[in-house]
Every structure is written in C-alpha cells, then in structure tokens.
Amino acid sequence: MATQFAIETTDGPPCFFGGMGSPKTSFQSGLQWLGRKGTRLGKRIVSFLLRERLKRYDFRLYNQKGQETIYSPYSILGIGMKELELKSGFPEHYLWVGPFGSSIERAENYPLDLSPYAGYKKVFVSCGTQLAWAKDNLLYQTQQLAEAHPDCHFFVTLGFGGQDFQCEELMDNVSVVSYLPYKEYIPQMDYVIHHGGAGIFYQCIIYGKPALILPHDYDQYDYAVRGLEAGIALTAKREDTEAIGRAFDELLARDDWPDLNRLSRAAQIYQPTEILKSEIHRLLGDKEK
C-alpha cells in the first residue's frame, strides 16, 4: 500500500487529523483515542448507509481480529520506513518495504544547468504535481525568502511534467521551472522546501537533504509531524510568512543533522524486491502445506 496512514492501528496518533504527533500528555492520548474511535465509527456509518450495495459482496468491515477486511489477511506490503512511524499496532502481517518510487519523466528532457549557481546555497522548492491552487502562494513565500537570503538560489518547480521544459528567472536568485525530476535534482541541492508529499519526503531522506515542510492537505500534515519528530525536517504553516522565515533561518543555521544521516543510511538497507519475493514464496509455501 502506498501510505501507512490509511490503515487503522490499535495505538498511536490517528492520521488525517491535521498531523497528530506522539502524545505528551494524558489529554493528548485521550484525544488520539477519540480520533481512532471516531475513524472507526465513521467507517461503520458509511458501511451502514451503503449496506444494500455491499450486500451482494458479502462485505464485512472488520474481521474477527478487528482488522479491516479491505486489506489482505495474508500479507500487506507498505511503502515507507518503520523507523519514522508514530503509529503502532499494525496487523502482524504488515511489512515495511522501504521508501521507493521516482518520477517517470526522463531527466534529459528537463535540462537545468546548475553550474552558474555554484556560489549559492541551492534550495529546491516544490508543492508537487497536484496542488495547482497552491502555486501562487508558493511563489510568494519563495520571493520573501529570496529577498532575505541573497546567498541562496531558489529553484521552484511547478510540477508540470510531460510538458516542454521552461525556465524563467523570477528574481536574481529565484528560478521558476516547469518541472524537475526529484531523483536527479534533489541530490544536487542543499535544502528542500516542500509540501509534505510522500515522494519528495522520502527523496529528501534518501539523499540526506534537510527540509522545510509546508503541509497543505490530507496526509501531508502527518508526514510533516513525522519529519519534525524524527529530527530531519522543520515545518511551518504554508501562508505564515513570518513562521516560514524563522523556520528557514533555523534550517540554514543547523550544521549537523545526525538523525537525517542515520535515516538516510537506514533507507538504503530496505530491499523491496527481495521482500516481495520472500512474501510470495512464503505464501506459496503456506498454500502447499
């Protein structure tokens, strides 16, 4: 499964509630318990309302173990890293396969020469490919940071993959490009500002790049709080210019990111293909028995 946030667990912060982190008080623990119960109640209500349609499939929302039947009872392979997760109580057959996945676009179709910016701290800025409504604010916030940090050069990608490559110099130290593949360009950057999408979140970990996360919706808040608690990223509200400025200052001021280095090494250990093969052999072996 593409995100561990969708599946219910028996403990830990529920997801899609604005980014709940590890509980620090009994009150926060109580809120998270209510969140988990509320999630389950919401699903039961929807299932009840659709009961006539679901009847033909003999659908049951939960099995005897209290686990969701929409997921396999034999094996669930989850993209992501166990080292980052705040939830606990996953089904016993849930396996982490590590962070993977990259752009399908070819890097040679998006030629951006970075050599003229060798004297700058290079900052990759993105809000992904699906948040068209957020791009104006992203450009505005980037311009504010660029004015305050002339020693940095900001590369804003608009996420228009599949189109002809375009590059516009919005300011002396702001380049706006139509699209840049993460895998090829993030390794060449010093810092990343992003929206908290799964792909860029893990690319920053893989290549050891400190990030400032400005979450916009859905599970992006959950990624942001995990990045913050793991010590690999900072976060701010997407339209709070002052908070973004302070967070970016802190990002630049930090010389050492030991947790980021540790998690970057951990990300390399995962072998998703081997895990998949192992699970296939295990399941076939169980069937033969």
Task: Describe each region flagged by the PLM.
Residues 2-4, 196, 213-218, 235-239:
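Short beta->alpha connector loops at strand-helix junctions that form conserved
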Residues 74, 94, 152, 173-175, ...:
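Short, conserved active-site loop motifs that form the nucleotide-linked donor/cofactor pocket
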Residues 1-32, 83:
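Conserved nucleotide-sugar donor-interacting segment of glycosyltransferase catalytic cores
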Residues 126, 140-178:
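Catalytic donor nucleotide-activated moiety binding site of glycosyltransferases and closely related
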Residues 37-122, 129-130, 160-161:
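A nucleotide-sugar donor-handling region in carbohydrate enzymes
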Residues 179-225:
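A donor-sugar binding/catalytic signature common to diverse glycosyltransferases
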Residues 243-289:
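C-terminal amphipathic helix plus adjacent low-complexity
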